[in-house]
Amino acid sequence: MRHSITVGEAKVLPQAGINLVRVGSMVPSAAALSGWSPALRIPEAHGFRSLLLHGEGLSPWSDQPKTPLALDRLGDGAVLLQLFLRGNPFRAGLNAQEPWAAAIQQLIALNRLAGVVVYGSPYLWDSLKPLLPSSCPAAYSAGQMQEAQRQVLNALFPTATQTGHSGAFTD
């Protein structure tokens, strides 16, 4: 699985923010994205509040092409984008309906982009990666399963050092 994951050097800083998770649809993604999924739990453990987006839910989009994310609907704080979208070159027009490139540029301009993870779509990753500054935590995984989420997010989030627990028994 490690050969199908690409992770940059930058790390996500623990902070109060939004874990914005876009799934292609709720039913097919249910196995990869349950209430205990690493895509939800790891960012939440670092101060992010999870918001799930899917085609049947409320839209996060404004009518402004250069600032497409309606940030007032999301709340304050940095935004970690996790995009669970399958790559299909024959359905490219469907992905064009959601302006993720412009949303990333909007978040960069506002200094609110905490990081980007793309699961499943190499086409989307290839289009978004050139937009990201080298200081932006970013990763791609061909797989969407929970083990892929765990590996990607453990690489992106710094490991908290545990103080006071060495693991040794004392009396």
Regions found by a protein language model. Name each.
Residues 1-171:
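Preference for extracellular/luminal or secreted protein segments
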